[in-house]
Amino acid sequence: MNKTGYILAIARGHNAGACLLKDGKIVFSIEEERFSRRKYDGGPYAAMIKTLDYTDKIDALVVAHTQNLQDTAGKVDYSGDDVYTGIARKLKLISPYGTSGFGAQHPQVHDLSSIHHKLHASCAFYRSGFDRAVAVIADGAGTFFPLNNERQESVIGYEVESVFSCEYPANISTIYKHMGTRDIMQFYEGPISMDDPLTGPENFYTIITDRAGITKTYEAVTNYCGFTE
């Protein structure tokens, strides 16, 4: 069996899961907690193995998260590839010869961690039925961005609110982004340029603050009231 036209998309963080597509149609979609029986479980390892029930080869592994694979996903001993690339390689879903090893990026693996809010916008837009729309995303912490404060110290910023212009079939552009940080940060308001791994550089309006954003405020209140798992 050597099927082609398959894309395996995985989400790494809480509520981790996998979705297998064949020529743009969903073959299966499942969260890791269905295998592990642990609510909201991360690391969709069992979900990736489930792919073998449908195909022994995929054309691409697409990874969604808020932080990049190379720095945060853990490493396979000796070869140095991240654990998700390593699992796909060892299961022979992707080519075992795709990299020179020792941490190199596999050409069949696509890390979309730098556009986390845009992925949320895409999910909303493609399920909406609209040909054109504006998507507003409010999130606890989207993509992690390295920033420098007024003292030129390195701090981490997080996407907290974003606005996107969406047009079918595949034009989703950033209009506005609010980035927050837990560190001391001078308020910034104005244009900024960031790279999209799919479409290249993007220019949009942004504000950077030392505030957590709407969603984290809501989360703090619900946690205080005991509305947790």
Question: Where do the PLM segments sit?
Answer:
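Short acidic/glycine-rich loops and adjacent helix/strand connectors
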Residues: 1-229
